[in-house]
Amino acid sequence: MAVDPVTLAVIQAGLQQVCDEMDLTFSRAAFSPVIAEADDRSDGIYAAEDGALIAQGARGLPVFVGTMQFSTRHLVARIASGETSAPEPGDIYIVNDPYLGGTHLMDVRFAMPFWRDGRIFCWLSNTGHWPDTGGMVPGGFSASAISAEQEGLRLPPVKLFKRGVLDREIWQIICSNIRVADQRIGDVNAQASALIVGAERLGLLLDRYGDATVAAAIAEMRAIAARQMRAHLAAVPDGRYVARAIVDSDGVVNEPLVIALALEKAGEGVVFDFAGSSAPCAGPMNSVRATTVSAVYLAMRHVFPDVPLSAGAFEPFEIRGIEGTFLDAHYPRPVSGCAAEVSQRIAEAVFAALVQAIPERVPAAPAGTSGNFALGGHDPETGRDFVMYQISGGGYGGNADHDGLSNGCSTIGISKAPPIEIMEQRFPVLYRRYALHEGSGGAGRQRGGFGVDYEVELLRGQARASFVMDHGRVGPQGALGGGDGAVNRVEVIRDGQVMVPEHLSKAQDIPLAPGDRVRVRTPGGGGYGPAAERDPEAVAEDVRLGRYGPEAARRLFGWRG
């Protein structure tokens, strides 16, 4: 069935609007600041037969673009095999199993079948980052976990809502295995409500244009996305481009992990070969296949953002060589660092390879860490336990035309640090500092952007801090002769003494007492092009604004001021 261009455009925009409304509903109704303020969530529409991506909200985390279609695919397959009970109208499944198309345990997915005339037309699904899903440490970021069980509660696909009603028995099992369980029902209701709103809006779209027309439009959208991506790839010079990226350590063995990438471009297709990457690791920096593949998709979306979000956009890609490496984790390997950290190293490797081929389109490496900092304890003023989860921005890499953005969100999405006023209101902490990490941008013709420098103090009670970050050993890569960005630095300050974690950017279960402080300085982006070619007036302006000190400007840029 052919769909005329005008109708196709309207339906495509309508599907996007459905996803955007789900995103907004989820954020506005959520209880947790990490969802309501930091936007660590995503919503989308997926094919009934195989979970392929149809549309995804523009306000959600792009890293979920791949993982949510994989988790939906696993759900569909398990229903077909009888491992998971068959759906009925009003059912909503919950799943967070990383090995079934997921990321880490804190990313909890809901999936709801959308019914038309007694059959499933498509799936609506969303993901939200829960502040805690159990495990060794509050917040789930166990830097020294050596098995999945130590990271928290792992849920296979199971119905949390049956015919529109919350299954209290399943909910009690979940609540019995997570911290601050009394605070999660607000997020659960928000997550389910987002899907219900999506179903209402999608139903109106189908009523207006008809099921057959919308189905034909979806098929055409997928074909168009594939053609557009192939057209972009055809303009990339054929060749083999080799790059690598470094993960500081796995949190258990204090040695770097290597992501090796050979990007082979021929015609309208591209192969991403990760053979030679490090073996599976003991600690939580393993990556499940869905996250690895999604990170490649994400990186290519950064380079070619005009290609519509659809499964068709990824058809020209072949990803291989991950078997037997830490980029293809299987149970029971721990994986809490994969979604927020390893995924960004994978994207960095893709950028480092592609900048050799199309330097005008690809930047130097961004900060590439989400700055995961979890603080859990008891607040004597409220008489309640708490789990605080802080993410933070960093510098973007310079590019052919501009300096890198400062304090930008991470490579994997749009998540931003929650406002400190909200954090201070909700948790027993005080932010003593929140500023740019001066001097952190990598030197270059176009310098990297600057990271963030913040310091937070525990005001009362007792708490325990955990960190799973990266780029503490090696800063974000410069490109085409540019310098690397500054490394990530974590400090715990107690009675005037400064403690730096053994693994630099990873540690867990550090006890904090009132007056103890945590200071985090996130990386700057890599520089682009030789620093000696930077406009002297631009260097002088950076010095005037305090972005670099005079001595640093002379050393890095050869400034004569």
What is each model feature region?
Residues 1-89, 97-116, 120-561:
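Glycine/proline-enriched, intrinsically flexible loops and inter-domain linkers
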Residues 92:
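Glycine-rich phosphate-binding loop of nucleotide-binding enzymes
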